[in-house]
Amino acid sequence: TTALSKRKTAFCLGVIIFLASYPLFLEYMAIGHDLPFHLLRIDGIKAGLSQGVFPVKIQPVWAYDYGYATGVFYGDILLYFPALLRLMGFSVQSAYMTFVAVINLATTLISYFSFKKLFNSSRIGLIGSMLFTLSYYRMLNVYTRAAVGEYCAMMFLPLIFVGLYQILTMTEKKGWWKKAILPAIGL
């Protein structure tokens, strides 16, 4: 690939990321169905970290400061990023919006490289990335439902799919475990 086609690809990926993140540039933050719960999770992790607790399993800001074990029922690992932003002085809204932008970036790149690998075509990688990242269901999860766990999990679906495809289409059975790394990372 030439430098020009790499620049075109980078530009197209940037447009996809911008379109997926456009609602973040509005003057207000849309309140999704589950958003208050997840904002409290971010603040709970921040409070636990500021008290020197890691990993934060019982978040101290819940239940009138008695704490609640949301970290036992929900995977919190990706929410440590906005919690660290909170510790650096970001508002909870800014930390969450930055988190969503980073998830949109990661979803776009993971889906692009997965579709590119699967079809051996940069163009199909771009189309697949656009269709996946901007799909109605994913955007609904991000901005209407605020289903953090679901849209974070969706980020890894193309990676799981390409890894399983590689395992199932291998001609030689030796070294299958190397191909199993991609879907394992996605899970």
Which residues fall in each region the model found?
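Start-transfer (signal-anchor) and selected internal transmembrane alpha helices
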Residues: 1-24
